[in-house]
Amino acid sequence: NCHVVSYKDTGILIDAGLAGKRITSGIEQADFDIDKIQGIFITHEHSDHIKGAGIMSRKLDIPIYANFKTWCGMKDKIGNIKEENMIVFDNDKTYELGELKIRPFSIPHDSEDAVGYNIYSDKEKMSIATDIGYITDNIRNNLKGSKLVVLESNYDPNMLMMGSYTYALKKRVMS
């Protein structure tokens, strides 16, 4: 789980769930200037969303943004981050970074305090919500007016059942 969102000279990562080298390689393959990445916005503390966050923050000297509960759940998993690069935000407030405005909103997930993001340029709005099992009224309201919506809430039932997850985790994923 890792998305690059850019507008003009501002780029951000939504999650960094891959190894840092893989994120860097993907950005380079997309012919995007990695130096335009100005921050990493985390949706929740699960490893498939934070694996490369610390590495990318240290490599690019950029901040990681997450709400308080997510920071509490991930700070021991991402390595040492400069204090000035540890940004705690409040859900449902709008933050500016370069030429983008980013507004986190709550989503249901079995994590500390998962969020989706509304991202605004001076022209358009886009929304990203990952690991959602169902659409709540809050999600529906936050997606309204978006020119682009990225939703991720799937799994392959055969892969899941044949995989090495515990039965309890398989039941959670299927819920």
What are the roles of these predicted feature ranges?
Residues 46-50, 71-73, 111-112, 135-137, ...:
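Active-site environment of divalent metal-dependent phosphoester hydrolases
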Residues 1-30, 115-131:
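Conserved beta-strand hairpin/beta-sheet module of binuclear metal-dependent hydrolase folds
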Residues 137-175:
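Cap/insert and terminal regions of metallo-dependent hydrolase folds
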Residues 13-17, 38-45, 65-68, 127-130, ...:
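Active-site neighborhood of phospho(di)ester-bond hydrolases with catalytic His/Asp-centered motifs
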Residues 105-149:
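Hydrophobic, well-structured mid-protein blocks that either form specific transmembrane helices
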Residues 20-67:
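Active-site metal-binding motif and surrounding structural segment of the metallo-beta-lactamase
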Residues 68-123:
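Metallo-beta-lactamase
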